[in-house]
Amino acid sequence: MATELRSGYTTGACAAAGVKAAFLFLQGKPWQEISLTALDGTPLTIPVKAVTQTEDGICAEVVKFSGDDPDITNGVSVYTTLRLRDDADGIVFRAGEGVGTVTKPGMSLPVGEPSINQGPRELIRRVVAEMTGREDTGAEVTIAIPAGTELAKRTLNPVLGIEGGISVIGTTGVLRPMSEEAFKDSLVPQIDVARAAGEEVLVFVPGKIGQRIALSLGISQKAIIETSNFIGFMLERAAERGTKGVLILGHTGKLVKIAAGIFHTHNRMADARLETLAAYAAAEGLSQTDVRAVLAANTTEDALAVIASAGLAERVCAVIAARVRIRAERYLFGKMKVGAVMVNFAGEILGVDEQARAFADACGWRLNA
């Protein structure tokens, strides 16, 4: 029987527990273990490591527990400082060390606000109301996650314009082992930020290598969207938002899958890379012996070397890029224009379709293939 995965609690729940611990400290009551009700009604019990009085208020430290979710903040300390204010109505949120600040429009929070999402804010408001018996208690809540300054480099925050650290997140307060759907949804705000910045043509790349290559072609960082393996999902989200067009820029291994109609490109979902290359190369005149060599290749780069030795690489790559466009636009039922640029790991352009060239001319990109 499969073992049930353990749930944990979010950084937002850690902060809310810290606020409640601060109130209990002020009241002279035990604060070492905090009971909370998550926004979805789930009861939470969160241990508190320390509570101290500082010049800025009462500071509580809670160590994040992520359960069986592969979360980068597992084990980090979340410090929440509570300062009650008679001169204010409601709660003012502040970003402490390692918590980011919103610097670009398009997010759910205004520019200049600490990146403390609405779920944690609401959970903290409920805690303050519970502990004071009032909805309008004046308070200043500062959340610091010192490890967040470095951890943010491993997130999409720099792309989203969240500077200075990570975000305090959590929809309900409960951290359940991340589903694929949750990961996909975490990618979508990139599109909103790019659209808010005025980018009408977006550039989809699977990861950091694609991003580096895109920048080398003169493509604006604001237009670059990391999609991971979820090309189809992200195309749909872009089309829903009225995006004028998308350029798909990626390595041969990704683009040949899209040319075959595969829009979730993880190798456990589907892997017809060599078969697709072999089919298009054969259609362009590759010999039967070389087709077998393509099918026996270890990688798409090895397969392309076989095709190149026959003098067909340029033609085959151009056909594949064109086929990516056709497949993607068909996938979207013609709701958005799509172009394709295929590159190798060295960043050399192997294939470009006509729509990609049109995008490049309009946007000033350098596509030299």
Language-model segments: what does each one mean?
Residues M1-R154, P158-L160:
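Generic N-terminal targeting/processing segments that precede catalytic cores or assembly contacts
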Residues R6-Y9, L160-I166, T171-L350:
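A structural signal for small-residue-enriched, beta-sheet-centric alpha/beta enzyme cores
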Residues Y79, L217-S220, D353-F359:
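Surface-exposed flexible segments
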Residues T155, F183, L187-D192, A356-R357, ...:
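Bulky hydrophobic/aromatic packing residues
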Residues K337-A369:
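Short, amphipathic C-terminal "tail helix"
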